Amino acid sequence: LGVGRGGRVTRLSLPARLEGCYLGVSDLGLDGDIPGFCAEALLHEAKKQNMRGIFADIEADSPAARALLGPLDRLMHEAGLPLFVPLRQAGAVEHALLVAETAISGGSLDGYFEELQRQYPGRIAATLRPVSADFRLPAQDSEGHPLTEKERRALQHTCGAQAFFSRELCAKYFTYMDERQNGHFVLYDDRSTLEAKLRRLDALGVKHIFALYPDVAALL
């Protein structure tokens, strides 16, 4: 389902009828006054379709988002159904599970999730999002320049760079110098690193892990 301006709920098409899954809720321009029955409608739909819970994939930190997620959090908790929201919505909910991304470019994957679990005991889930980015050194941000797999392979071949595994980031990387002698750091995931991340998360006790199909097709 999608939720737009004024809490309008729109049914998005799926290739097949699904039961026993999680109901996904997308942000379709969520804005304005959000009536109380909007959260009730989402819970009703989850029950009607025999869903296991709801994943409200709403990233915006806005009054409208909080007006929807707060009541939805309460209703889902009372109904005994899990609600998942992005980590950045932690301040808008009291009971929902918080979904953190595995695509990090600094620090330690284990340390990151261990700290989150200390902050929110029993409430941390994960989304397995492969990283593939080129960072010019010194890095100016945590996102870098995104690369497709084809672009990354071509770049590595052209530079003749050797790839290494970072235990801290649980990802592979290589470095190279561009034509202006600027240093670059390319960080990426492949099947082996995604499998390693799943093992790490399992060892850390993270029980709920989400992923988009195209991102993890190699694992299936």
Whereabouts are the PLM-identified features?
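Active-site region of glycoside hydrolase catalytic domains
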Residues: 66-67, 74, 81, 111-138
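Extracytoplasmic/secreted proteins, especially bacterial periplasmic and envelope-associated proteins
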Residues: 37, 41, 67-71, 108-111, ...
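Acidic/aromatic/glycine-rich contiguous surface patches that form carbohydrate-binding/processing clefts
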Residues: 197-220
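Chitinase-like catalytic core of GlcNAc-active glycosidases
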Residues: 1-108
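Short acidic, glycine/proline-enriched helix-loop-strand junctions
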Residues: 64-82, 163-174, 178, 218-220
